[in-house]
């Protein structure tokens, strides 16, 4: 198969913009049932670990336009204090994004279908994602309550660690958005793969929106030896 046939996705960096709605949980480490690579350890502070799950709407002006459901945990590199977000589950509705995400950043993208609905007067966003057999992966209901003035955007670092080609890789994007606190959040059914994060049936500590975000995401790079 030719190079053109095997790499049908845009080269990094990807320039992304759109809307993000997500929730963060603080959990007992024993609730989290995902298997981490040997190079990574769950980051535990005061007996608690952190998990995230949320919906993203990559809108026109992005390298690719698609929807996404993403979940993961905060980890640290073995024998190091380097910490980052580790993507354990991720679904998109674009084949180019799926292939590019797997091959450029090592994230385990799969395909799903999405329903998004915005209700601007009430500042409400609802969403659902499901796979081809009809299984619901997650639902979301967010209503913004307070936050930065909409025109004001603050930078938030977004470090990521993943395994790629059998070794740890890192990527780091800066996420510029108007951050808003939300009522509601991401809801995960007990039979969803995301339930392995320990978040099904648990209330998040915070739900938020990153409105009108912009992000520049360079290709993942191998982590230099830390031993």
Language model segments and positions:
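Interaction-surface and assembly-scaffold signal
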Residues: 2-4, 99-227
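Aromatic- and glycine-enriched beta-alpha-beta binding-site module
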Residues: 54-133
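Generic detector of short, locally flexible boundary/turn motifs and exposed helical patches
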Residues: 35-40, 50-55, 78-81, 89-95, ...
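N-terminal domain-onset segments
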Residues: 1-68, 78, 201-204, 218-220, ...
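Short beta-strand element of the conserved SAM-dependent methyltransferase core
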Residues: 21-27, 71-73, 180-187
